[in-house]
Amino acid sequence: MTRSIFIHTLLALSALTSVHGANSPGCGKNPTLANGVHQINGREYTLKIPDDYDANNPYHLIFGLHWRGGNMDNVVSGDSIQPWYGLESRAQGSAIFIAPNGLNAGWANTNGEDVAFIDAIMEQVESDLCVDQSSRFATGFSWGGGMSYSLACSRAKEFRAVSVLSGGVISGCDGGNDPIAYLGIHGINDPVLPFDGGVELAERFVGNNGCQPASIEKPQSGSNGWKRTDFYGCSKPVSFIAYDGGHDGAPLGVQSSLAPDATWEFFMAA
C-alpha cells in the first residue's frame, strides 16, 4: 500500500467513526461545564450532568425540547409533564440531559437557526464532557415535537432516534431523506396539531427506513386507552402510539408512564 493510499484510508476511517459513533473529545478531561444554565451565541440552555459523572464513561446525550409558550425551565421542573419528559429518572445516571431555550418561546427555526443552535450546543458540551456520539436523542411536545422532527429530517446522521409528542411540520424539514429511528406519540382527538398530521410525520420515516406499510391502530374515543403500531422490515425502527386524548405534553396524564416508558425503551433499543 502506498503512503498516499494509506493516508486516504486513515482519513476515510476517521470520517466513518465520526459519523457512526465515537467517544466525544471531552472524554478523559476534567470538565469545566457544570449543572445549570449556560450560554452560547447569545442563547441559553440548561445542562444536567449525572451526579456520579465519570469522564472516562461515554454517556447518552438527550435533548428535551419545550412546547410553544414554554421554556427550558418547564422541561427541567416538569411543569405539566414529568421532569425531563420522565426520562432522567429512567436513565439512572446513564445520560447527560440538555434543555435548550427556544426563541420567542418557540422553535420557528428560521433559516435553520434552531438546528444551528443545537449543533453549537452539541459541540460545546461534547468538547467538555464524555458523550457516546452514536447515542444522541431528542424529544419534545407540540412545537418541541416539531423541532425534534426537524432534527430527524436534517440531522439523521447525528442523532440515533427521536420521539415526537403531538408534533407537526412547524419547524421545517430540511433534507428529510435519511433513515433514523422514529417514535411518534399523538392523541386521536388533538385539536391543535391534528392526529393525521402526526401520522404523516411518521410515514416519512416509514418510507425513508424501508419499512413495510401498515395501518395505524387507534383506540376507541373515550376508552382512555392507547394502541401501538410497530412497523416491520425497517432499516431503523419506526413505531407510532395513538392514545385517547387531545394535545397533551403528558399523554394520559402526568402520572402516566406511557410516553416516558415508551420513549426511553425506544431510545435504548434503537
From Swiss-Prot:
Keywords, sorted A to Z: Carbohydrate metabolism, Hydrolase, Polysaccharide degradation, Secreted, Serine esterase, Signal, Xylan degradation
Annotated signal sequence range: 1-21
Subcellular location: Secreted
GO BP annotations, alphabetical order: xylan catabolic process
Primary location: secreted
Chain segments annotated as transmembrane: none
Gene Ontology CC, one term: extracellular region
Catalytic activity annotation: feruloyl-polysaccharide + H2O = ferulate + polysaccharide
Single GO MF annotation: feruloyl esterase activity
InterPro entries hit by this protein: AB_hydrolase_fold (IPR029058), FaeB/C/D (IPR043595)
Source domain of life: Eukaryota
EC number: 3.1.1.73
Enzyme kind, highest EC tier: hydrolase
The family this protein is said to belong to: Belongs to the faeC family.
Function: Involved in degradation of plant cell walls. Hydrolyzes the feruloyl-arabinose ester bond in arabinoxylans, and the feruloyl-galactose ester bond in pectin. Active against paranitrophenyl-acetate, methyl ferulate and wheat arabinoxylan.
Protein name, as recorded: Probable feruloyl esterase C
Gene this protein is translated from: faeC
